[in-house]
Structure formats: structure tokens, C-alpha cells
From Swiss-Prot:
Residues with the Phosphoserine modification: S19, S163, S385
Protein name: Flotillin-1
Gene name, Swiss-Prot/TrEMBL: Flot1
Species per Swiss-Prot/TrEMBL record: Rattus norvegicus (Rat)
Molecular functions (GO terms): ionotropic glutamate receptor binding; protease binding
Residues where Phosphothreonine is found: T387
Organism taxonomic ancestry: Eukaryota, Metazoa, Chordata, Craniata, Vertebrata
């Protein structure tokens, strides 16, 4: 069956299958009846009134001290809970409180024996801290933690503390009387010093007033001299300033004129620039556009001429090749003809020569009469004897032609008449 407990209580289950025993602080646990056992231990805080009656201090003065301590079994620490269960399981809260009280009282007595009455009385915090420290280290082994410790009361049966209070009161009263006398003395001294300082201050004040009056008179005279000097300087400076002002006004006027002239020049320059831009817009840009157009046309014509020239060059080259081929063919034909003529000349010799001369004579006669055919006008001058008119011209031509065989003989060394006489008769 299940058992539960609050946060101020712990349960310890022992018996079958519970070795070591199970400790649960503020929770629930399952217990098998008859074969398992459950026990509870309180975790409540215990308030202890620790009284130590007539304990002799370090100087042998017996006093009584009462302290208040708060202690409890620590359930969150498993080791301390186990130690508390070993020592206090089955005991009531009163029994646990009595054990803790006896332990605290013993430590409190030990601390009192090592301190004087004055130390305990004057420094209660130190006494409380020492008791808390020593008692905590001892009670923690029992599973009990000291939550707090405070010294509540100190008293004795021999009026030792009262005597300490009287002595302190007398000392305080003595110090008060001494302080009062010293204060009165200091007040008289300060009053005498104040009176002396007052007289000294009055004398010094009168001296200072005299010095001040003297300084005032001297400074006034100095100031008067300086004022007159400054006034004269001011008058002179005023005149100089007036002259400078006039000069500056004149300079400003000149500068204004210069600025106006500069502005006029700037306006004229702007007008010139505007006219130049207008001229450029109306004349230069169209001229440049026309020049650009003409340049493009010239480049186009140039390209066209180059193409035409290249085409003509190609045509000339092809024509030249054709003419060269024709000339070559004609030369070959003439060479073949000349070769045949040479063979015929070799065979017929003088007859062939005569045949060739007779063949060329018409051409020679044509060349001789060529100048006459190209003449536009012929003027005949007669000496009065012989024929006249066309008969005269015809006679001249015939005379030239009759001299043709003689010219051929001079040129070639061949006589036409001789070759003709020696020519053999052809047989049919």
C-alpha cells in the first residue's frame, strides 16, 4: 500500500527488499504490509532557548547568557538525513530538541570561557558567530543544521556589568565636563582673537581706505592724462579715419566702375559667344554637314573610280593577254610565211627578190605620195615655161615614181631592171 508525508516529514522504509532502507522526504512510497516497516521522522524547525547560568569568563567573572537557536533535521541532504535517522529515528521532537540544546549549551559555555565580559558585552556579533560556527560543525554530524543563533541576554549577580556602566557613565560625564571647559576656554580665546582681529581689521581697513584714496587720486590723475591723450588721439584718429573713409569711398567707386566695366566686358563676351554659337548653328554646322556629305560623296566616287579602274585594269589585262595571244599567233603565222618565203627565195633567188620588190613597190609609191594626199591646198608657181595645172602636178609625181627603181637600188643594192633581164622564162 502507499504511504505519503508532507514536506516537513520524512519516511524510512525497511524490511524485505529494502536494504539499505529507503528514505523519502516529502513524498510517497509503496510499502508491502507485514514484510516491510515504515517509520517517520520530523523535519520541523526547532526553537531552542540556550541558557548558560553563572559561567566564568576568561578573567573569572561569572555571568549568565541566554541565546536563541533555530535548528532542524536537513531532509534535502541524503547523508545528513541518514545520520539523523540513525541517531533520532523513533524519538520525539522534544527528545531531539533536548539533545541539540545540550550540545549548543556546551559550546556556548566553551565560547564564554574563552572571552572576557567586555568582549561578550561589547561585541555580541562576534560571540554569536563563534557559537554558530562551533555548534554547526558538531551538530551537522548528527544530521542537524543550525539555521540561526542570536545572543538574547547577558546578566550577572555581582553588578559587574552595572559597574562597567557606571564607570562608562562617569567617564562620559568627565569627558563632558572637560569638553565643556575646553569649549568655554576655546570660546574665550576665540572671542579675544575675534576682538583683536576686529581692531586689526578696523586699522587695516582705515589704512586700506587711505591707500585706496591715494591710489584713487593717483589713478585719477593718470586717467585724466590718459583721457586727454586718448581724446587728442581720438580727434587725430577721427580726422585720419575721415580721410581713410574718403579714400576708401573713392576706391570703392573706382572698384565699382571696374566691376561695371568687367560686367560690360562679360556681357559683350557673352554676346560674342552667343553670336558665335548662332553663327555656328546657322553657318558652320550646315557647312560642316555639307562638307561631311561631300566627303562621303567623294569617298563613294573614289571607291567607284577605284572599282572602275580595277575593272578597266582587268579588262586591259585580259585584252592585253588576248592581243598578246593574237600577236603571237600572227607572229607564228608570219614566221611560217617568212620561212616559206625564205625557202622560195632560196629556190628562185633573183626571181623571188624581184617578186618581193614588185610586191612592195605599190606600198613605197603610196608612202611617197602620202604627203600629197594629206595636203589641203597646193599652190603652183610657174616660171613661164613648161606645162601648167594638173599636168604639172602629174608630171612631178611621175618623175618621182620614175626615180623609184633608182632609190630602191640605192637602198637595197638590187637593180630591178637587171633582175628583170636575167629572169628566166616560165614554161607552161
Amino acid at each position: 500500500m502507499f504511504f505519503t508525508c508532507g514536506p516537513n516529514e520524512a519516511m524510512v522504509v525497511s524490511g524485505f527488499c529494502r536494504s539499505p532502507p529507503v528514505m523519502v522526504a516529502g513524498g510517497r512510497v509503496f510499502v508491502l504490509p507485514c514484510i516491510q516497516q515504515i517509520q517517520r521522522i520530523s523535519l520541523n524547525t526547532l526553537t531552542l532557548n540556550v541558557k548558560s547560568e553563572k559561567v566564568y569568563t576568561r578573567h573569572g567573572v561569572p555571568i549568565s547568557v541566554t541565546g536563541i537557536a533555530q535548528v532542524k533535521i536537513q531532509g534535502q541532504n541524503k547523508e545528513m538525513l541518514a545520520a539523523a535517522c540513525q541517531m533520532f529515528l523513533g524519538k520525539t521532537e522534544a527528545e531531539i530538541a533536548h539533545i541539540a540544546l545540550e550540545t549548543l549549551e556546551g559550546h556556548q559555555r566553551a565560547i564564554m570561557a574563552h572571552m572576557t565580559v567586555e568582549e561578550i558585552y561589547k561585541d555580541r556579533q562576534k560571540f554569536s558567530e563563534q557559537v554558530f560556527k562551533v555548534a554547526s560543525s558538531d551538530l551537522v554530524n548528527m544530521g542537524i543544521s543550525v539555521v540561526s543563533y542570536t545572543l538574547k541576554d547577558i546578566h550577572d549577580d555581582q553588578d559587574y556589568l552595572h559597574s562597567l556602566g557606571k564607570a562608562r557613565t562617569a567617564q562620559v560625564q568627565k569627558d563632558a565636563r572637560i569638553g565643556e571647559a575646553e569649549a568655554k576656554r576655546d570660546a574665550g580665546i576665540r572671542e579675544a582673537k575675534a576682538k583683536q582681529e576686529k581692531v586689526s581689521a578696523q586699522c587695516l581697513s582705515e589704512i586700506e581706505m587711505a591707500k585706496a584714496q591715494r591710489d584713487y587720486e593717483l589713478k585719477k590723475a593718470t586717467y585724466d592724462i590718459e583721457v586727454n591723450t586718448r581724446r587728442a588721439q581720438a580727434d587725430l584718429a577721427y580726422q585720419l579715419q575721415v580721410a581713410k573713409t574718403k579714400q576708401q569711398i573713392e576706391e570703392q567707386r573706382v572698384q565699382v566702375q571696374v566691376v561695371e566695366r568687367a560686367q560690360q566686358v562679360a556681357v559683350q563676351e557673352q554676346e560674342i559667344a552667343r553670336r558665335e554659337k548662332e553663327l555656328e548653328a546657322r553657318v558652320r554646322k550646315p557647312a560642316e554637314a555639307e562638307r561631311y556629305r561631300l566627303e562621303r560623296l567623294a569617298e563613294a566616287e573614289k571607291a567607284q573610280l577605284i572599282m572602275q579602274a580595277e575593272a578597266e585594269a582587268e579588262s586591259v589585262r585580259m585584252r592585253g593577254e588576248a592581243e598578246a595571244f593574237a600577236v603571237g599567233a600572227r607572229a607564228r603565222a608570219e614566221a611560217e610565211q617568212m620561212a616559206k618565203k625564205a625557202e622560195a627565195f632560196q629556190m628562185y633567188q633573183e626571181a623571188a627578190q624581184l617578186d618581193m620588190l614588185l610586191e612592195k613597190l605599190p606600198q613605197v609609191a603610196e608612202e611617197i605620195s602620202g604627203p600629197l594626199t594629206s595636203a589641203n591646198k597646193i599652190t603652183l608657181v610657174s616660171s613661164g615655161s613648161g606645162t601648167m595645172g594638173a599636168a604639172k602636178v602629174t608630171g612631178e609625181v611621175l618623175d618621182i615614181l620614175s626615180r623609184l627603181p633608182e632609190s630602191v637600188e640605192r637602198l637595197t643594192g638590187v637593180s630591178i631592171s637587171q633582175v628583170n633581164h636575167n629572169k628566166p622564162l616560165r614554161t607552161a
